[in-house]
Amino acid sequence: MEQEDVIYERCAGIDVHKRMIVVCLRIGRKTELRTFGTLTHELREMTAWLKGSGCQMAAMESTGPYWKPLYNIFKLEELPAMVVNA
């Protein structure tokens, strides 16, 4: 099997729900899972954690409009993010 190139050494996968957000931060081969609420101060806490960890890209999956407040905070804090749906 051919090995793929690493694009982001420090990245996050985020599953956004109405009242909860689950984040998997990956740094190299190490991962850390955290759960956050969806209030503004909780979104800011999550953003500070990701930025403090050196996160280079956050990819979030969301059904419905629940990703929008988080995306707006990421944009204000200059944390690169994308919305993806499988």
What is each residue range found by the language model?
Residues 1-86:
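Phosphate- and other anionic-substrate recognition elements at nucleic-acid/protein interfaces
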